[in-house]
């Protein structure tokens, strides 16, 4: 018996909506990355994008445990000497509510063309309204 390998045109991508209210950042990100990658499906193939579309709402109500709101620091560099910028979780979450979850999920996905295709299937919104009603996303409960 040959090992099954999914073909890109055979894969059915479903749409799910996740409510991030009072969910822990890392646990939610791990569950979302698992779904985006398609590892929950029996047809999972490492070199084929078998994952689903995930719409995350209420990301502004996301939380972190302990003192991470003040202690967790995100770094970025401008490319110029001395151009290192530091931002705490609390500041970033207040200014760009979706960015901490996006960075967490992106770090859990593979790097390269396949990983970039997977992260494009993640849609994040601060409120409870999203423009993807036409896709009829199913509600997905993640215990994070």
From Swiss-Prot:
GO cellular component terms listed in the entry, alphabetical order: cytosolic large ribosomal subunit
Pfam families from the UniProt entry: Ribosomal_L13 (PF00572)
Keyword Ribonucleoprotein appears in the UniProt entry: yes
Entry GO MF terms: mRNA binding; structural constituent of ribosome
One GO BP annotation of this record: translation
Keyword annotations of the record: Ribonucleoprotein, Ribosomal protein
Recorded superkingdom: Bacteria
InterPro entries cross-referenced by the UniProt entry: Ribosomal_uL13, Ribosomal_uL13_bac-type, Ribosomal_uL13_sf
Oligomeric and partner information: Part of the 50S ribosomal subunit.
Matches recorded under PANTHER family: LARGE RIBOSOMAL SUBUNIT PROTEIN UL13M, RIBOSOMAL PROTEIN L13
Role noted for this protein: This protein is one of the early assembly proteins of the 50S ribosomal subunit, although it is not seen to bind rRNA by itself. It is important during the early stages of 50S assembly.
Family to which this protein belongs: Belongs to the universal ribosomal protein uL13 family.
Protein name: Large ribosomal subunit protein uL13
Top-level taxonomy: Bacteria, Pseudomonadati, Pseudomonadota, Betaproteobacteria, Nitrosomonadales
Gene that encodes the chain: rplM
């Amino acid at each position: 018996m040959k090992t099954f390998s999914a073909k890109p045109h055979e894969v059915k991508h479903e749409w799910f909506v996740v409510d991030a209210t009072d969910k822990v950042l890392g646990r939610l990100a791990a569950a979302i990355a698992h779904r985006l990658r398609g590892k929950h499906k029996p047809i999972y193939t490492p070199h084929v994008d078998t994952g689903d579309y995930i719409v995350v709402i209420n990301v502004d109500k996301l939380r972190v445990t302990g003192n991470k709101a003040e202690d967790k620091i995100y770094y970025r560099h401008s490319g110029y000497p001395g151009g290192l910028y530091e931002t705490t979780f609390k500041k970033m979450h207040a200014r760009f509510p979706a960015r901490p979850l996006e960075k967490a999920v992106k770090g859990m996905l593979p790097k390269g063309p396949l990983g970039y295709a997977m992260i494009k299937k993640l849609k994040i919104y601060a409120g409870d309204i999203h423009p993807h009603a036409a896709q009829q996303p199913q509600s997905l409960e993640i215990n994070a």
